[in-house]
Design a protein with these regions (language model features):
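A short beta-strand-loop structural module common to alpha/beta enzyme folds
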Residues: 1-9
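Alpha-helical cap/lid subdomain in secreted, periplasmic
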Residues: 12-156
């Protein structure tokens, strides 16, 4: 099941995490958050605070007995709805924080960024995005394959 809501930030996700995710008693919980924070959908928030929100959700899931997959933020070099933001370096920094947290807190890190990045632009390749942030069906297919190969061993 998916509990994602378009436009929500990590703070929004954290607020509804117990009712929307923990209450479902999933064996595995996947968390993908950060781009709407970087886009300042709710105003400025530091990468440290974004990570704190992600960590809070991961800890709630683990306390509930779920295994946790922490997904990287996808590559982005533009935010169409907030063009003043230059997200590429912020995404790279947040992903390094998420990865370090995952490695030190018994979570699995799913690195979409490395597989999907256009090294020249530090964003998504044009063929995989509709606007620099949101992905095409082709990109979803790549992500689905990566997600399922990460998920399957955790279900054993």
């Amino acid at each position: 099941m998916s509990a994602g809501i378009g436009g929500h930030t990590s703070s929004d996700m954290r607020e509804r995490f117990v009712s929307d995710v923990i209450s479902k008693n999933g064996k595995v919980v996947s968390i993908m958050a950060g781009i709407n924070d970087i886009a300042q959908n709710d105003g400025y928030i530091s990468n440290a605070d974004i990570l704190n929100n992600i960590a809070s959700m991961a800890e709630m899931a683990q306390r509930g007995g779920s295994k946790v997959i922490l997904c990287s933020v996808l590559p982005a070099n533009t935010i169409g709805w907030n063009p003043a933001i230059r997200p590429a370096d912020l995404v790279i920094d947040l992903n390094s924080r998420i990865k370090a947290y995952a490695e030190s807190h018994d979570c699995v890190y799913l690195d979409y960024w490395t597989r999907l990045v256009d090294e020249n632009t530090k964003g998504l390749p044009a063929a995989l995005t509709t606007d620099g942030v949101h992905v095409t069906d082709e990109c979803y297919e790549i992500m689905e394959e990566m997600f399922l190969s990460t998920l399957k061993p955790l279900l054993k």
